[in-house]
Amino acid sequence: MVLDLDLFRVDKGGDPALIRESQEKRFKDPGLVDQLVKADSEWRRCRFRADNLNKLKNLCSKTIGEKMKKKEPVGNDESIPEDVLNLDDLTADTLTNLKVSQIKKVRLLVDEAILKCDAERIKLEAERFESLREIGNLLHPSVPISDDEDADNKVERIWGDCTVRKKYSHVDLVVMVDGFEGEKGAVVAGSRGYFLKGVLVFLEQALIQFALRTLASRGYTPIYTPFFMRKEVMQEVAQLSQFDEELYKVIGKGSEKSDDNSYEEKYLIATSEQPIAALHRDEWLRPEDLPIKYAGLSTCFRQEVGSHGRDTRGIFRVHQFEKIEQFVYSSPHDNKSWEMFEEMIATAEEFYQSLGIPYHIVNIVSGSLNHAASKKLDLEAWFPGSGAFRELVSCSNCTDYQARRLRIRYGQTKKMMDKVEFVHMLNATMCATTRTICAILENYQTEKGILVPEKLKEFMPPGLQELIPFVKAAPIDQEPSKKQKKQHEGSKKKGAARDVALESQLQNMEVTDA
């Protein structure tokens, strides 16, 4: 995931100042741009010298061959003249005046210089890449510039009644329908572990079916992805911070051969976007085949480092969940990817409108975008039991930022003298099932249970197509209120104080008094 290097090169039509400005708007280090430009300039100088040295080496070999053909004297191990030691100034005429033995010595010096130059070039390439991979995509002009997501995300539009309030939150409702085992899940799987069971398993499967059929009717190809990826491929689709904060690493045998003791690192996927992005790795995509649209289905695994204390109860923020994803490969021309961007968020909106979930669309501020996204819109559903908007969908246009490192090129083959173009890649959540279940539970709660959304009824089993009944009491109703807790604690303290006073009084009393 990187920008085009030519964007940093003024002589190639690039504009480093534009990238520096984009970095500043992202509230990231603009100094990375200067570091990259410096390393790239030195790398290009080094490569130019290496090219000249290789030409000089070929010239040495050619001159030796001509002299041997003419049967000129080889020489008696004469030393190289001082003026010849400066390899950068050597010419064919200079070599012609040397003996064969001298030219061979010059060629050895050239070999040493090439090795030294190659080592320097590799070092500069590494320095340049370190900066390049931490520089974000160029921002779309419509992105709000701010580093405060809570205050400055721009609300683009609202659908449905986002003011209604209801009694219970999803944390209580998953228990009331007996569809969730949290404590036992944590014992088995650790923090945020859970068992989804009973009616909520059916509801989840109904959502998956409805989402896949909706996307299939719009030309998306359903695709069930691998759950883990090789490290070298994951590095091409995920930014560096994700390896520490989001991704789970697994280590397994590197081969199925019993005598092979090697081990290989792999990473569990955080979203089907990652394996689908790599699906056409190292390919040329024909213009007539675009757009290519996939409806990804996968289990997703996320560490959620940094979210300690947030949404610790229930199934809204968990380490493992199912998700249906929109993923599109688009033409880089004629604004096609931005037209597709609007189409994808519209598809997500239609899905949640058909489920009757109120929401608003927000334009995410520049400081909260990941490196790849040029722009991101989130669909945040209204949760009437929690009294808050919560994110269900993220829709991003990554332009050619991902495709470049994956080498997914636009066209059939490179044309002579033409620059290689890369496809644009876009992704958008369709349905993260656990979060959507939470939204349905809060919006469709009644006194007796959860009404089933009209569009999901055909996918639910008999007896659960109209209403999912409450079968357990709400945990919040079982817990004493804060006022009751305070009164209870106060009475305990008063009782303890009375006991201490009485004990003291008894110790000070005389026997006759007793």
Swiss-Prot record:
Q: How does it assemble?
A: Homodimer. The tRNA molecule may bind across the dimer. Interacts with SIRT2. Interacts with METTL6; interaction is required for the tRNA N(3)-methylcytidine methyltransferase activity of METTL6.
**What GO MF annotations does this protein's record show?**
ATP binding; enzyme binding; molecular adaptor activity; protein homodimerization activity; RNA polymerase II cis-regulatory region sequence-specific DNA binding; selenocysteine-tRNA ligase activity; serine-tRNA ligase activity; tRNA binding
Sites where Phosphoserine occurs are at S241
- Per UniProt, which keywords does this protein have? Acetylation, Aminoacyl-tRNA synthetase, ATP-binding, Cytoplasm, DNA-binding, Ligase, Nucleotide-binding, Nucleus, Phosphoprotein, Protein biosynthesis
> What reaction(s) does this enzyme catalyze?
tRNA(Ser) + L-serine + ATP = L-seryl-tRNA(Ser) + AMP + diphosphate + H(+); tRNA(Sec) + L-serine + ATP = L-seryl-tRNA(Sec) + AMP + diphosphate + H(+)
Per the record, what about its domains? Consists of two distinct domains, a catalytic core and a N-terminal extension that is involved in tRNA binding.
Q: Which intervals carry biased composition (Polar residues)? A: 504-514
Listed EC numbers = 6.1.1.11
Site (Important for serine binding) at: T429
What name appears for this protein in its UniProt entry? Serine--tRNA ligase, cytoplasmic
Tell me what gene encodes this: SARS1
Q: What is its main location?
A: cytoplasm
Which family is annotated?
Answer: Belongs to the class-II aminoacyl-tRNA synthetase family. Type-1 seryl-tRNA synthetase subfamily.
A Gene Ontology annotation in the biological process aspect, one of them, is:
cytoplasmic translation
Q: Which Pfam families match?
A: Seryl_tRNA_N (PF02403), tRNA-synt_2b (PF00587)
- Which stretches does the entry tag as region Disordered? 475-514
User: Which compartment or compartments is the protein found in?
Assistant: Cytoplasm; Nucleus
N-acetylmethionine is carried by which residues? M1
Q: What job does this protein perform? A: Catalyzes the attachment of serine to tRNA(Ser) in a two-step reaction: serine is first activated by ATP to form Ser-AMP and then transferred to the acceptor end of tRNA(Ser). Is probably also able to aminoacylate tRNA(Sec) with serine, to form the misacylated tRNA L-seryl-tRNA(Sec), which will be further converted into selenocysteinyl-tRNA(Sec). In the nucleus, binds to the VEGFA core promoter and prevents MYC binding and transcriptional activation by MYC. Recruits SIRT2 to the VEGFA promoter, promoting deacetylation of histone H4 at 'Lys-16' (H4K16).
Residues that coordinate or bind L-serine: T271, R302, E325, N427
Q: Where does ATP bind?
A: R302, Q303, E304, V318, H319, Q320, F321, E391, L392, V393, S394
What is the main EC category here?
Answer: ligase
> GO CC annotations?
cytoplasm; cytosol; nucleus
